[in-house]
Structures are given as C-alpha cells and as structure tokens.
C-alpha cells in the first residue's frame, strides 16, 4: 500500500522555500512576519551593541582564566577538609581579576543571593553600627535579615540599626536626604543596582560611582556595598571599577 503524503511531510524539505513561507505553513501570516522583521530591524543597532559588550566581557573572563592558568587540574575533586582546594582558589582568583577586586569569595555553600548579601552584612556590621539604604527598601528577602520585618537572628536583634532614604519621584538618588541620613553611626551603605520587583529604573555604573563618591566625601571610612544582581556584564565596567 502507498501512504498519501500530507502537507506536514514536506515542511522544510524544499530548500527553495523562503523563511516567510515556512512561517505561513506554521500559521504565522505574512503581515505578522513583516511586522516582526520591521521591529527586529529597528533594534538591530541596539542588539549589536549588546553583542559587542558581551564579547568584550567574554574576553575579560578569558584573559583572567589565562592569567590564572585554568586547567583540567582545577576540576579535580579534593579530599579531607578542603584545605588548599586548587580549583576553588583558582576560581576565586579568576573572579577577582575579572571584577578587578582584591579578593573574592565564591563557594558552593552560598546558596543564593540573599545568603551572599547576609554574609557581607553580618561580616561588616557590629552592634551600634547603622546600615543605610540610599536607594529605598531592598529586596523583600532582606527584610528579615536586616530586621525590617521582625526575625530571630536579624541584624536588628544584634543591635544594628537601619535607616532608609527613598528615591525621588523621577527614580534618582535624593542626595540632600542622603547627606542628612549619614551620621557617626553609619558604617555601611547598601546600594541595590537592580530595580528588583519595583518600577524604578535600574542604576548604571556611572550613577553608582557618583553616589559612592558623594557618600565618601561626607564619611570617607564608610563601607559602600553594591548588590550587583542582574547587573554583571551588562556594561564594560562594573561597580567595583568605580
């Protein structure tokens, strides 16, 4: 017996068929296809810039790997207590060189971003210190860490106070209010780069650098901590460069 071929049997087999015709066979009209092509063309320059930024940052990572001689040996497991874990130590050097920092802490035991932020906060703040958030309230997951929402073991329970300065209506830093908020107890300024779950714009490295310079001009010994979540490699420079 001979089975009759249906239309789906020949889809994509004719090399002369155009992309638009293939989409039409999938139920996408030529009008929709043309509209999509028009939008894609209008965004071409922007996406080319994204690609250039990605390539630039990829080269930075590759150079850091070459500098630290990443090899197959780095992927071998260690035994005992994990002292002198060659792969772990090399990975941290790669991160440090990529982001231009003195050192880096990259561990599988750090389970999430909130965990990493909590480590930085608890590692730098002591009873009597004050934490300042100049970009408004941080992520909801940090509320219990800081003590905005009551929680056992929070910074507030250990005697660390919290002060917050909301952004102006246009989404920019309120420098006058920040100046007034900084006092002798201010130990750490936490800057959340991403808008997170809010409607405000995310901050550029330039904006963050200007804020840090402003804060340091008022209190040079204050620690400026940047939550760079979702911001890595979207520019050619990072907050650690400013």
Q: Each predicted region: which residue ranges?
A:
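Ubiquitous "structural anchor" signal
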Residues: 11-13, 121
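Conserved PLP-enzyme active-site core in the AAT-like
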Residues: 22-29, 35, 61-62, 71-74, ...
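Glycine-rich phosphate-binding segment of PLP-dependent enzymes
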Residues: 37-101
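PLP-dependent enzyme catalytic core of the Aspartate aminotransferase-like
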Residues: 15-16, 213
């Amino acid at each position: 017996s001979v089975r009759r071929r249906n239309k789906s049997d020949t889809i994509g087999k004719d090399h002369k068929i155009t992309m638009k015709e293939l989409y039409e066979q999938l139920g996408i009209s030529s009008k929709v296809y043309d509209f999509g092509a028009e939008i894609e063309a209008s965004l071409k320059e922007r996406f080319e810039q994204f690609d250039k930024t990605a390539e630039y940052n990829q080269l930075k990572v590759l150079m850091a790997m070459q500098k630290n001689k990443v090899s197959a040996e780095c992927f071998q497991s260690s035994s005992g207590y994990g002292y002198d874990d060659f792969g772990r130590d090399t990975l941290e050097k790669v991160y440090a060189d990529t982001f231009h920092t003195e050192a880096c802490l990259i561990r599988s035991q750090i389970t999430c971003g909130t965990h990493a932020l909590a480590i930085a906060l608890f590692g730098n703040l002591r009873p009597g210190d004050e934490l300042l958030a100049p970009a408004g309230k941080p992520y909801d997951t940090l509320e219990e860490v800081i003590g905005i929402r009551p929680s056992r073991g929070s910074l507030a329970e250990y005697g660390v106070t919290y002060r917050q300065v909301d952004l102006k209506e246009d989404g920019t830093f309120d420098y006058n209010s920040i100046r007034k908020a900084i006092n002798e107890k201010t130990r750490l300024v936490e800057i959340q780069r991403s808008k997170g779950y809010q409607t405000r714009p995310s901050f550029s490295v330039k904006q963050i650098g200007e804020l840090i310079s402003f804060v340091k001009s008022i209190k040079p010994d204050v620690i400026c901590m940047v939550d760079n979540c979702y911001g890595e490699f979207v520019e050619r420079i990072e907050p650690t460069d400013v």
